[in-house]
């Protein structure tokens, strides 16, 4: 495996870009390696600048549910670009994507487009505070909702990877309005509401936590959050930036039949281009300017290229059998992977839901932040390096999720399993 060109580009990047990357986890610090610079992607594969091919289980951190360079998505982007890359004015494409979202998710009666998941969650919290007239929000240990100041309190994703649960630069005045509960622990939520019953504007939660590895909601947890928030007059916000359109044509809320007050989206709804969205009931969304008094704006919000890519992606998901294909591939891969893990004396575990999965270097059941943190990150780093040598690209952090796309096939599954088996045999004998 050659990496000379990637090493050269990383050195050059560090001269001009902090840390040489534009998002921390990409630096590969958590796996003790230099990052790979990717040249192109097609289907289930990516190719680095040194000519190495990898089966990709990062999929741009979730947006590429159809795989890389899907012909219909590429065509939609090209056709939109030929007419203009940005207008700073309303365009028909944004109505089309908004309608697709609203028709797919019953709780979303109106939706506002933004440019990232961070913008979506930040704007949703501002709206919740204005609507309720309250200041506090409740989030959960290890859950990541973007990098707005009020979310960088015991957060997940890159902050877990870096070992910094609360980012420097977040004023105490912001932090004191963010209350932190334990995922899958309703009692911890009840205690916070008991302490500040009239001050909590909203509870924001990943209905399937995907930023401390994959952690599934236990039976009754999401239902309990809905009951508690209603009882105290707070809003419930589902952060479906990862889970939206991942498991079905809609949100995870469609599957569990729970309607939050607000929903945030991103990733898949942009088809690989920068996008975010937040939506909910009309009486809440109509507080947003220019209809109401809660301000939010963006130069590139509703960008025609992102809207076209997102609409093309959602239409394919709605019309085809992608979800059945995703489940079949994931069941095949993870079913056989469980057999491999069982050979290692209870030192490994795995969580899966549909086309998301995480392999943890701990034998304990992973159900919350504290159990995630028992993972052996050193062994994961070694494992990751062995996978790359075998042509399999997993997230460069123990605390991120693997994504399966509709482009992955049985050939990919077979090679992945052989590579994982070999990598684990070597990793687990290392001290």
Curated annotation (Swiss-Prot):
It holds the Pfam family Aminotran_3. Pathway: Porphyrin-containing compound metabolism; protoporphyrin-IX biosynthesis; 5-aminolevulinate from L-glutamyl-tRNA(Glu): step 2/2. GO terms for cellular component: cytoplasm. Keywords: Cytoplasm, Isomerase, Porphyrin biosynthesis, Pyridoxal phosphate. Its EC number is 5.4.3.8. The keyword Oxidoreductase does not apply. The modification N6-(pyridoxal phosphate)lysine is found at residue 267. GO terms for molecular function: glutamate-1-semialdehyde 2,1-aminomutase activity; pyridoxal phosphate binding; transaminase activity. It catalyses: (S)-4-amino-5-oxopentanoate = 5-aminolevulinate. CDD domains: OAT_like. Its cofactor is pyridoxal 5'-phosphate. GO terms for biological process: protoporphyrinogen IX biosynthetic process. It is found in: Cytoplasm. InterPro entries: 4pyrrol_synth_GluAld_NH2Trfase (IPR004639), Aminotrans_3 (IPR005814), PyrdxlP-dep_Trfase (IPR015424), PyrdxlP-dep_Trfase_major (IPR015421), PyrdxlP-dep_Trfase_small (IPR015422). The keyword Cell division does not apply. It comes from the Bacteria. Belongs to the class-III pyridoxal-phosphate-dependent aminotransferase family. HemL subfamily. Homodimer. PANTHER family: GLUTAMATE-1-SEMIALDEHYDE 2,1-AMINOMUTASE, GLUTAMATE-1-SEMIALDEHYDE 2,1-AMINOMUTASE 1, CHLOROPLASTIC-RELATED. This is Glutamate-1-semialdehyde 2,1-aminomutase. It comes from Syntrophomonas wolfei subsp. wolfei (strain DSM 2245B / Goettingen).
